[in-house]
C-alpha cells in the first residue's frame, strides 16, 4: 500500500484488518512516499513497532503511484500480493474469503471482490456487485478495480508499471495479469469500501484527467500484445473505452438471414434500413419465405429481387413455423462464412453495424455478437440476456434509451451468457460446430440454447451497445395467446430446465448473485 500525504486518522482505519484478524498469515507493506511528513512517519513507525507483520519501505521522494507500488512489490514475501488505496477500508474477513477461494482452487492466479463507497458521513452506499471474469467489460473499464490480488509468482513475470500508466496503473496491471492467469476468481461479497473524497475519482471523475489517457494506452497495449487489430478511444463516460475491432482483410461476405411471413411493409422497412444505411457493402440478404398468403408480399418479393438481383435471394420454407428449422434452412442456403440472423421487424439505426459486429465476431474467442435493441418508444428492449430466474430474461428492459443503467453497464461492450437472435452474428464454423439451432425449440429460447452451446465450447457471447436497432417485437408472429401456444411454451421451458440444469444451479456467471432476477425488466436494478 502506497502512502502519500495520507492523513493519519485515515491511516488508522487501515489497521482494522490487524485489530480484528480473521486470518493471521499476512504482511502489510507500507510504502511511505512522504518522507518529510513527520506526523505520518511517526504513525508508520508506531504501527510497525506494534506488529512485526507490518513493514515500511521509506522512499526518498514521491515517484508516482506506479513506481511507489513497484517498491512494495519488490520486497513482498507472500504467495499473493494485494493492492489497495491508502485511505480506504477493508472488511475483517476479506483475507479469509480470499484464502478460502485459493484453498478451493489451486489454479487461482487473480482475485477480486465487490465493493461500495464510504461516504463523508461514514455511511456505506452505491454497492458495485460485479460479474465474474468478463474480458470485454475489462477492456471497456477497470471493473475489477480495488483489492486486486495476484499470485506473486505470476506478478514476478510481468513487466512493472511505469509512470506513463499513473492513474490507470491498476487497469494496466490487471490486463497484463489476466493475459497469463490460469484462473480469475470473483468473490461475490462487498469486502472493500472506497472512500469518497474531492480528489478521488470515486467522487470526481475530473480529478485525474490524465487517468483516461493512461487507460486508453493500457487497453491498446493489451490488445496489441494479443495481436488483435483494434482501435481504442474514450467512450461516452469517463474512464471507459470504446474498442473497435478491425474487419478481416479478406472483407468477407456476410449473409443476413431474415425469416418472414406477410406484412410486406414491415419487411420493407427492415430491408430499406439495411440497404440505405449500411456502410459495409459485402453482404447478401437471404429472405426465408414462410407460408405468406398476401398478394402484396409476393409482389414485394418480385420487386425486391428485380431491383437488387446481386444482393437479395429468396428461399421458401413450406412447412409450419419453427424458428429453429427456419434458421437452419436459411443458413444451409447462405453463401457467407459470417451469418447475421435478423428478425424482419427490426430497423437499423447504426450505419456501421455490420463491420462493428463483424470485427468482434472475427475474433477467435468469440462465438456470437448481439446488439442493443429499442422499442419504438425509445425504451430498451434488449441489452443482453441473463440466464437465470426462470429460463432467461432481457437486461435493462423498458429503461429509457439514454439511461445507461446500473454502473452504466448497458452502455458497456461486455460478455454475457446469451443475446437475442432478433439480431445476432455468428461464424458459420461455430454455428455448425454446435449443430445450429435446436429444432425441438420451435419458438422460445432457441437463441439462449444456441448461445449456451457456444459457451459450452468456451466461445464468448459479446454484447455491443455500439450497434443499435429498433425492434417492433412479434409483429409477424403475434403473442402466446392461445392454449396450444402456451402448451408449446411450457414444453420449451421444460427442455431448457433439463438441458441446462447445471447452468441454472450454478448461476449465470455474468450476473452477480446479489441481484433480484425474477422480475422482468428489473434485472440489474433490484437488490
Task: Give the positions of each predicted feature.
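N-proximal low-complexity "stem/linker" segments adjacent to membrane-targeting elements
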Residues: 1-19, 220-276
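Nucleotide-sugar donor-binding/catalytic module of glycosyltransferases
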Residues: 1-207, 221
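Acidic donor-binding segment of Leloir-type glycosyltransferases
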Residues: 18-58, 275-316
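Glycine-rich, basic loop-to-helix element that forms the pyrophosphate-binding segment
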Residues: 59-76, 317-334, 352
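A recurrent flexible, glycine/aromatic-enriched loop bordering the glycosyltransferase active site
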Residues: 66, 74, 125-153, 166, ...
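Conserved donor NDP-sugar-binding/catalytic core segment of glycosyltransferases
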Residues: 93-125, 197, 346-391
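A short, conserved alpha-helix in the catalytic core of glycosyltransferases
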Residues: 154, 164-190, 219, 353-357, ...
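C-terminal, non-catalytic tails of nucleotide-sugar-dependent glycosyltransferases
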Residues: 208-251, 377, 389-416, 420, ...
Amino acid at each position: 500500500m502506497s502512502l502519500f500525504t495520507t492523513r493519519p486518522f485515515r491511516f488508522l482505519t487501515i489497521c482494522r484488518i490487524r485489530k480484528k484478524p480473521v486470518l493471521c498469515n499476512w504482511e502489510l507493506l507500507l510504502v511511505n512516499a512522504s518522507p518529510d511528513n513527520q506526523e505520518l512517519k511517526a504513525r508508520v513507525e508506531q504501527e510497525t513497532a506494534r506488529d512485526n507483520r507490518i513493514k515500511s519501505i521509506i522512499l526518498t521522494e514521491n515517484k508516482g503511484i506506479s513506481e511507489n507500488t513497484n517498491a512494495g512489490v519488490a520486497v513482498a514475501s507472500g504467495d499473493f500480493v494485494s493492492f489497495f488505496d491508502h485511505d480506504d477500508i477493508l472488511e475483517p474477513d476479506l483475507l479469509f474469503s480470499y484464502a478460502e477461494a485459493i484453498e478451493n482452487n489451486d489454479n487461482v492466479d487473480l482475485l477480486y471482490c465487490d465493493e461500495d463507497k464510504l461516504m463523508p458521513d461514514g455511511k456505506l452506499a452505491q454497492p458495485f456487485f460485479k460479474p465474474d471474469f468478463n474480458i470485454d467489460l475489462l477492456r471497456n473499464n477497470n471493473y475489477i478495480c480495488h483489492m486486486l490480488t495476484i499470485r506473486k509468482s505470476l506478478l514476478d513475470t510481468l513487466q512493472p508499471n511505469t509512470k506513463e500508466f499513473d492513474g490507470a496503473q491498476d487497469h494496466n496491471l490487471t490486463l497484463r495479469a489476466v493475459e497469463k492467469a490460469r484462473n480469475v476468481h470473483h468473490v461475490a461479497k462487498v469486502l472493500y469500501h472506497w472512500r469518497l473524497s474531492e480528489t478521488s475519482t470515486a467522487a470526481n471523475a475530473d480529478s485525474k484527467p490524465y487517468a483516461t489517457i493512461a487507460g486508453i494506452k493500457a487497453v491498446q497495449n493489451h490488445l496489441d500484445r494479443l495481436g488483435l487489430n483494434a482501435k481504442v478511444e474514450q467512450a461516452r463516460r469517463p474512464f471507459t473505452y470504446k474498442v473497435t475491432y478491425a474487419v478481416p482483410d479478406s472483407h468477407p461476405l456476410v449473409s443476413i438471414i431474415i425469416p418472414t411471413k406477410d406484412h410486406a411493409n414491415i419487411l420493407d422497412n427492415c430491408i430499406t434500413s439495411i440497404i440505405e444505411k449500411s456502410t459495409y457493402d459485402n453482404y447478401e440478404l437471404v429472405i426465408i419465405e414462410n407460408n405468406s398468403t398476401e398478394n402484396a408480399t409476393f409482389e414485394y418479393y418480385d420487386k425486391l429481387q428485380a431491383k437488387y438481383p446481386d444482393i437479395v435471394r429468396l428461399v421458401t420454407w413450406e412447412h409450419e413455423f419453427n424458428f429453429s428449422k427456419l434458421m437452419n434452412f436459411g443458413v444451409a442456403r447462405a453463401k457467407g462464412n459470417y451469418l447475421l440472423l435478423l428478425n424482419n421487424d427490426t430497423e437499423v439505426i447504426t450505419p456501421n453495424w455490420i463491420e462493428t459486429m463483424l470485427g468482434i465476431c472475427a475474433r477467435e474467442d468469440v462465438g456470437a455478437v448481439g446488439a442493443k435493441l429499442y422499442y419504438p418508444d425509445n425504451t430498451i428492449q434488449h441489452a443482453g440476456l441473463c440466464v437465470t430466474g426462470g429460463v432467461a430474461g432481457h437486461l435493462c428492459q423498458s429503461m429509457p434509451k439514454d439511461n445507461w443503467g446500473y454502473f452504466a453497464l448497458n452502455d458497456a461492450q461486455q460478455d454475457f451468457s446469451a443475446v437475442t437472435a432478433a439480431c445476432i452474428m455468428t461464424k458459420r464454423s461455430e454455428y455448425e460446430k454446435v449443430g445450429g439451432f435446436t429444432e425441438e425449440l420451435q419458438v422460445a429460447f432457441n437463441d439462449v440454447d444456441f448461445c449456451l452451446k457456444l459457451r459450452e465450447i468456451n466461445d464468448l457471447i459479446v454484447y455491443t451497445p455500439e450497434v443499435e436497432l429498433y425492434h417492433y417485437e412479434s409483429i409477424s408472429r403475434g403473442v402466446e395467446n392461445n392454449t396450444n401456444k402456451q402448451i408449446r411454451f411450457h414444453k420449451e421451458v421444460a427442455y431448457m430446465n433439463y438441458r441446462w440444469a447445471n447452468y441454472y444451479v450454478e448461476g449465470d456467471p455474468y450476473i452477480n448473485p446479489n441481484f433480484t432476477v425474477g422480475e422482468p425488466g428489473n434485472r440489474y436494478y433490484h437488490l
